[in-house]
Curated annotation (Swiss-Prot):
Lineage: Bacteria, Pseudomonadati, Aquificota, Aquificia, Aquificales
One of the GO BP terms on file: riboflavin biosynthetic process
Name this protein carries in UniProt: 6,7-dimethyl-8-ribityllumazine synthase
Family to which the UniProt record says this protein belongs: Belongs to the DMRL synthase family.
Binding site for (2S)-2-hydroxy-3-oxobutyl phosphate: 85-86, 127
Organism: Sulfurihydrogenibium sp. (strain YO3AOP1)
Single GO MF annotation: 6,7-dimethyl-8-ribityllumazine synthase activity
Length: 154
């Protein structure tokens, strides 16, 4: 029996990171977490390309472009969608999530999903480096591991 598991080493891996600027007080912290994760796991700043887009809705298209370029071992998507008083939150959160999943399946490039979908600003802050950890860091961990899993599979 052969068991394939991804190692948590970013050494030599190239990452594209897409970050939504909307709610930048949250997304910048997610970005810091993702970069910190890559560097702590042996990656280098030279192998990270960051693309900033207006908001979370623009992330899937940009992620697809990065993934299809063939330059990256993984793409990390970072954004924050915070519920307001209209149904806009539901539409954006659903479509962004579906779009990112579709990109990964179509391109066979691993995607680290770091889109916060929270009911309150406080919940977003908690997930961007305070009480609940940093979901940008977590998304980068997934990207590192999955890039290595797919390399192992061939």
């Amino acid at each position: 029996m052969n068991i394939v598991e991804g190692k948590l080493s970013a050494e030599g891996l190239k990452f594209g990171i897409v970050v939504g600027r909307f709610n930048s007080f949250i997304t910048e912290r997610l970005l810091e977490g993702a970069i910190d994760c890559i560097l702590r796991h042996g990656g280098s700043k030279e192998n990270i390309e960051i693309v900033k887009v207006p908001g979370s809705f623009e992330i899937p298209l940009t992620a697809k472009k990065l993934a299809k370029s063939g330059k990256y071992d993984a793409v990390i998507c970072l954004g924050a969608v915070i519920r307001g008083s209209t149904p806009h939150f539901d539409y954006v959160a659903n479509e962004v999530t579906k779009g990112i999943a579709q990109v990964s399946l179509e391109t066979e490039v691993p995607i680290g999903y770091g889109i916060l979908t929270t009911d309150t600003i406080e919940q977003a802050v908690e997930r961007a480096g305070t009480k609940m950890g940093n979901k940008g860091f977590d998304a980068a961990m997934v990207a590192i591991e999955m890039a290595n899993v797919l390399k192992s599979i061939g």
